[in-house]
């Protein structure tokens, strides 16, 4: 996917997601384990993404309920494999089991609660943990901003410490680089102010994270922080504050201090700036598509597209076993 030029500010939200979806259509559809798609919204998102050639779904959940939902809302699932599971918790466990059995390259949330799915994903026994901390990224299409914006973490890590933030940042950078958004993203580590002060611990952590990047402990991105939100995304604000930085004013990844601030930032962008947001969980054995009941059809498809492109890149980069 060709990155959006930094100088071309978009005036409508469709173009970035259109290109994202088009890029996902150009690669083979990702085998996707869809957990408990038992309502119209979640099942329609699966059907639409499959019809677009982005995913090849396996539906996991109460088969009778899934078929009744499809029939009631005139959704054609005749070509989909269905793995029966009695309820949402069993569906999550079965979905994780199918990933272990190499039946899917990504996991997708249906109509169950996020906590139910993530309990199965993060379980110490039989889950999908890796050595990397699991984190969430919103891939946001803000109409008035030139670049696609990543915001992390607004859904998984409540009060991340320095080590957790290291993984949160690395997860986001890896997604940006591997899913085709570009190379060496500009990463702004946000706080309330752009100066380091002992009275605001997040400013100290931001400075430490930047030094960790200098020492090669975080790779693949260009970090700066602490930065306040205005001087992270607005060149004039950065200039007025006298901030000289390759990141300030044109950040592509926004790293928030904690889940509360991240959630508020993402929802502010969605409701005030009319942004679309695609949610994906990283750091597990496979990418996990997390959608919300409030997501638009385009945002649901974009979530699948992001995860599909990432899964494709991982497949391409996987080491081959000599015969």
Placement of each model-derived feature along the sequence:
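Anion-binding alpha/beta catalytic cores of soluble intermediary-metabolism enzymes, centered on
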Residues: 1-247, 251-323
């Amino acid at each position: 996917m060709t990155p959006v030029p930094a100088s071309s500010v978009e005036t409508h939200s469709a173009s970035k997601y259109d290109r994202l979806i088009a890029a996902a259509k150009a690669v083979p559809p990702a085998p996707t384990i869809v957990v408990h798609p038992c309502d119209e919204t979640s099942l329609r998102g699966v059907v639409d993404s499959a019809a677009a050639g982005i995913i090849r779904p396996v539906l996991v959940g109460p088969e009778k309920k899934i078929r009744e939902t499809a029939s009631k809302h005139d959704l054609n699932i005749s070509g989909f494999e269905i793995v029966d599971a009695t309820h949402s918790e069993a569906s999550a466990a079965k979905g994780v089991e199918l990933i272990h059995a190499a039946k899917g390259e990504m996991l997708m949330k249906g109509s169950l609660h996020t906590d139910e799915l993530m309990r199965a994903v993060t379980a110490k026994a039989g889950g999908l943990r890796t050595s990397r901390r699991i984190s969430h990224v919103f891939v946001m299409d803000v109409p008035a901003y030139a670049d696609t914006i990543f915001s992390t973490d607004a859904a998984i890590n409540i009060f991340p410490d320095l080590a957790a933030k290291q993984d949160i940042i690395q997860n986001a950078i890896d997604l940006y680089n591997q899913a085709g958004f570009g190379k060496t993203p500009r990463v702004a580590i946000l706080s309330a102010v752009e100066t380091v002060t002992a009275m605001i611990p997040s400013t100290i952590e931001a400075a430490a994270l930047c030094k960790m990047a200098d020492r090669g402990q975080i790779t693949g991105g260009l970090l700066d922080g602490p930065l306040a939100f205005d001087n992270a995304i607005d060149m004039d604000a950065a200039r007025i504050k006298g901030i000289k930085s390759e990141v300030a004013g044109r950040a592509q990844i926004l790293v928030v201090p904690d889940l509360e601030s991240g959630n508020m930032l993402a929802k502010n962008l969605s409701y005030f700036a009319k942004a679309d947001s695609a949610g994906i969980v990283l750091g597990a054995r496979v990418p996990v598509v997390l959608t919300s009941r409030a997501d638009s059809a385009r945002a649901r498809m974009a979530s699948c597209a992001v995860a599909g492109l990432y899964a494709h890149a991982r497949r391409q980069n996987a080491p081959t076993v000599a015969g």
